[in-house]
Design a protein with these regions (language model features):
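N-terminal leader/targeting signatures
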Residues: 6-7, 37
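Hydrophobic h-region of N-terminal signal peptides that target proteins for export
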Residues: 10-18
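Positively charged n-region of N-terminal signal peptides that target proteins for export
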Residues: 1-4
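Short loop/turn and low-complexity linker motifs enriched in small/turn-promoting residues
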Residues: 18-135
């Protein structure tokens, strides 16, 4: 009986925690910037170096998050809602640029991401857990 209660409590806690997150996919289409791997950050935490033709999908806690690349001045603020699904494309126009993010419509982004490969787990350094500014 005690084991069942413990499992039920664990399930409820996990369900509640899962309900307080949204999904953020950061991706970069194949482009002509060979060797250019801008680093994606969420709230100052390193996520990954995003290679052309790759993506990383992660959970982010509900609340405001700031996504930046190597240049913190080119960030984007994103209000993550529980159960929300967000897509950020890494773009650059010159080799000297550190990369910027643009929020992409989910339908368009899914079509692009379906043609890409996920980054390997050992290439992803972090997750986006707490909202910037205390949510």
């Amino acid at each position: 009986m005690r084991k069942r209660v413990t499992l039920l409590v664990f399930f409820l806690v996990c369900s509640a925690a899962a309900g307080d997150v949204g999904t953020v996919t950061i991706f970069r289409t194949i482009d002509h910037h060979r060797g250019w791997k801008p680093i994606a950050f969420c709230d100052g935490q390193r996520i990954a170096a995003v290679q052309g033709g790759k993506y990383v999908k992660m959970n982010a806690s509900a609340g405001k998050h700031t996504f930046t690349s190597n240049n913190a001045k080119t960030g984007i603020d994103l209000e993550v809602k529980p159960g929300g699904d967000y897509f950020l494309r890494v773009v650059g126009t010159t080799l000297s640029e550190n990369g910027t993010f643009e929020l992409v419509d989910a339908v368009q982004a899914r079509q692009q991401v379906d043609r890409l490969e996920p980054l390997k787990a050992d290439q992803v350094a972090g997750v986006c857990r707490s909202g910037a500014g205390g949510q």
